[in-house]
């Protein structure tokens, strides 16, 4: 049987929020089968729990935010991406502020935390959402068109194409394909950092965004070049970060997908719109388990390898 997974022990990290600039502590704790991933605002007089789901997403401005009533947790996508990449199903995330820490701007630190705590099997079947028909959302037209699509696939494959019209980005790979059956999330995707442009920083900070951003947790570019002295971690780091974000956004569904995801110029908003369209299209998917692990897609039966 393909089983659900959680952590063997708890693990802890301290950092700042990318957009809020606030100091924040997170503690990742094991959770029972069928719990899902639950964020807990432990800084409030009464702890508020927010279970991840596509409909819990309340805002997608520059990040994915989940909410329960007026209580929110911002920028959950990098931690969610690490959970997706390492196939962690059940987890409590205790958090002391309203934004997940950005750490180094990628999912690598979250991968390290999860693997350091240890990932263990649980005595419950892992439930997948398997696509049976194609679901697609689009916005805009012509050169400004954005789209994202989920199609039937025996496994989990993601392909993404970017178009930023910037010399530093244009000099790198514009499209990447990642397949869970043949690639290593920790090695191939997790280290890709978020990125931004100096010309946007003043505007973002006027809106209360990017207050914790800098060269130590993002790739920063002026009009012509990358400002980080160390350069890129991957030749195609920009588009790989979009894959990283998409994996996190899609894992907010609450169950792992068996599908081919493909997108052009998509972001947090369109990814969530795609999930909501998927939920609306009840004819386009089914929930499946694998009693025989041999029948499961490659890449899901074993625990994810370390670095």
From Swiss-Prot:
Q: What class of enzyme is it?
A: hydrolase
Active site residues per record? 268
Enumerate the residues binding Zn(2+): 78, 241, 245
Q: Which GO terms describe its molecular function?
A: metal ion binding; UDP-3-O-acyl-N-acetylglucosamine deacetylase activity
What InterPro entries is this protein classified in? Ribosomal_Su5_D2-typ_SF (IPR020568), UDP-acyl_GlcNac_deAcase (IPR004463), UDP-acyl_GlcNac_deAcase_C (IPR011334), UDP-acyl_N-AcGlcN_deAcase_N (IPR015870)
The Gene Ontology CC terms held by the record are: membrane
Return one Gene Ontology term, BP aspect: lipid A biosynthetic process
Alphabetically sorted, this entry's keywords are: Hydrolase, Lipid A biosynthesis, Lipid biosynthesis, Lipid metabolism, Metal-binding, Zinc
Q: Which E.C. number(s) belong to this protein? A: 3.5.1.108
Q: Which Gene3D superfamilies match?
A: lpxc deacetylase, domain 1, lpxc deacetylase, domain 2
As its record notes, the protein acts as a catalyst of: a UDP-3-O-[(3R)-3-hydroxyacyl]-N-acetyl-alpha-D-glucosamine + H2O = a UDP-3-O-[(3R)-3-hydroxyacyl]-alpha-D-glucosamine + acetate
Asked if the keyword ATP-binding belongs to this entry, the reply reads no
Q: In which pathway does it act?
A: Glycolipid biosynthesis; lipid IV(A) biosynthesis; lipid IV(A) from (3R)-3-hydroxytetradecanoyl-[acyl-carrier-protein] and UDP-N-acetyl-alpha-D-glucosamine: step 2/6
State the needed cofactors, names only.
Zn(2+)
Instruction: Report any Pfam family annotated for this entry.
Output: LpxC
Similarity annotation: Belongs to the LpxC family.
* Function in brief: Catalyzes the hydrolysis of UDP-3-O-myristoyl-N-acetylglucosamine to form UDP-3-O-myristoylglucosamine and acetate, the committed step in lipid A biosynthesis.
Q: Tell me what this protein is called.
A: UDP-3-O-acyl-N-acetylglucosamine deacetylase
Q: Which organism is it from?
A: Albidiferax ferrireducens (strain ATCC BAA-621 / DSM 15236 / T118)
Tell me the classification of the organism that encodes this protein. Answer: Bacteria, Pseudomonadati, Pseudomonadota, Betaproteobacteria, Burkholderiales
Q: Which gene encodes it?
A: lpxC
């Amino acid at each position: 049987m393909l089983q659900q997974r959680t952590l063997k022990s708890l693990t802890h990290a301290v950092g700042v929020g990318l957009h809020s600039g606030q100091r924040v502590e997170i503690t990742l704790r094991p959770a029972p089968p069928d719990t899902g991933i639950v964020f807990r605002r432990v800084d409030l007089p009464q702890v508020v729990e927010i279970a991840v789901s596509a409909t819990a997403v309340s805002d997608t401005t520059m990040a994915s935010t989940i909410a329960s009533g007026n209580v929110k947790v911002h920028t959950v996508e990098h931690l969610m991406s690490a959970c997706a990449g390492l196939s962690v199903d059940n987890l409590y995330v205790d958090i002391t502020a309203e934004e997940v820490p950005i750490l180094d701007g990628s999912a690598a630190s979250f991968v390290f935390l999860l693997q350091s705590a240890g990932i263990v099997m649980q005595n419950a079947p892992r439930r997948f959402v398997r696509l049976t028909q194609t679901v697609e959302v689009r916005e805009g037209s012509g050169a400004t068109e954005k789209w994202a699509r989920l199609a039937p696939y025996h496994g989990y494959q993601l392909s993404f194409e970017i178009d930023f019209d910037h010399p530093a980005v244009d000099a790198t790979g514009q499209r990447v394909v990642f397949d869970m059956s043949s690639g290593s999330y920790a090695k191939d995707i997790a280290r890709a950092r978020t990125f931004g442009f100096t010309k946007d920083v003043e505007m973002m900070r006027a809106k209360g965004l990017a207050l914790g951003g800098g060269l130590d947790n993002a790739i920063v570019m002026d009009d012509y070049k990358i400002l980080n002295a160390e350069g890129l971690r991957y030749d195609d780091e920009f588009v790989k970060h979009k894959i990283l974000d998409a994996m996190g956004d899609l894992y907010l569904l609450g169950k792992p997908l068996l599908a081919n995801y493909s997108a052009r110029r998509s972001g947090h908003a369109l990814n969530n719109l795609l999930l909501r369209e998927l939920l609306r299209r009840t004819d386009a998917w089914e929930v499946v388990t694998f009693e025989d692990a041999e029948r499961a897609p490659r890449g899901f039966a074993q625990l994810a390898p370390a670095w």
